[in-house]
Amino acid sequence: MGLRIHFVVDPHGWCCMGLIVFVWLYNIVLIPKIVLFPHYEEGHIPGILIIIFYGISIFCLVALVRASITDPGRLPENPKIPHGEREFWELCNKCNLMRPKRSHHCSRCGHCVRRMDHHCPWINNCVGEDNHWLFLQLCFYTELLTCYALMFSFCHYYYFLPLKKRNLDLFVFRHELAIMRLAAFMGITMLVGITGLFYTQLIGIITDTTSIEKMSNCCEDISRPRKPWQQTFSEVFGTRWKILWFIPFRQRQPLRVPYHFANHV
């Protein structure tokens, strides 16, 4: 299965994603500079905590980049529909193309996406069948990284021993309080927003319902049999191996194939 790169030309989305990258860079540069490395050098924390911080940061960035550039499940212009599966397809009244049921036409991107959940400006891309798992990983690692950074910011002032060796000639130490206050504000704001989003995403997967279906009061779930949560998560992540649900470096293998899209997934 080849990786399909997908770019959305949207200045609003670029600004939103740029803000996310700025927050990530702000924390990945300043938190270690002000908190982690000084306390490590004075023996207050073990080095493994710094490795964990950078590990979570890398996973978060990889999930962000891949969720942004991975094709969410754009439908081809002339799909081949097997005769036995035509009942599972419908005609889009906006682009006049045949699409599998539960697909949706994204007005911002201008095409239909398989099992589209929503269009997310923060990744400048749709969240659909092929990149939903990356979006979930992004939510998870963003929340984990935010909690980690807030925890160290709190411990820096209220738990760790005061630093004895600080070069006050450096900008970051002269303006430490302002920098840490801004980091705490961004962290709390990010944590509140991402927690609500992550919760709704998990509920949607457990109930096998997309955000668009919830907003449109779709009644398909009445006729659709309820699946075990392990099955719905396995379909989203493309594997039944739960440990792989947390790895953003791999390729997703589709488990949900009610229609023939092996070379489009």
UniProtKB/Swiss-Prot annotation:
Keywords: Acyltransferase, Cell membrane, Golgi apparatus, Lipoprotein, Membrane, Palmitate, Transferase, Transmembrane, Transmembrane helix. GO terms for biological process: adrenergic receptor signaling pathway; hair follicle development; nitric oxide metabolic process; peptidyl-L-cysteine S-palmitoylation; protein palmitoylation; protein targeting to membrane; regulation of establishment of endothelial barrier; regulation of leukocyte adhesion to arterial endothelial cell. Residues 38-44, 155-185 are extracellular. Residues 90-140 form the DHHC domain. It is an enzyme of class 2 (transferase). The chain crosses the membrane at residues 17-37, 45-65, 134-154, 186-206. It catalyses: L-cysteinyl-[protein] + hexadecanoyl-CoA = S-hexadecanoyl-L-cysteinyl-[protein] + CoA. It is a multi-pass membrane protein. Widely expressed. Its EC number is 2.3.1.225. Pfam families: DHHC (PF01529). Belongs to the DHHC palmitoyltransferase family. PANTHER family: PALMITOYLTRANSFERASE ZDHHC16 (PTHR12246). This is Palmitoyltransferase ZDHHC21. The gene is ZDHHC21.
